[in-house]
From Swiss-Prot:
S-S pairs: none
Presence of the UniProt keyword DNA-binding in the record: no
Tissue expression profile of the protein: Expressed in placenta, specifically the fetal cotyledonary tissue (FCT) (at protein level).
Signal peptide: none
GO CC annotation: extracellular region
Domain of life: Eukaryota
GO process annotations (BP): proteolysis
Family: Belongs to the peptidase A1 family.
Organism in which the protein naturally occurs: Dama dama (Fallow deer)
Name under which the protein is recorded: Pregnancy-associated glycoprotein 39C
Length: 10
């Protein structure tokens, strides 16, 4: 799955 919950963005 793709989403803010699984992906860390800086």
């Amino acid at each position: 799955d793709v989403g803010p919950s699984t992906l860390a963005n800086n």
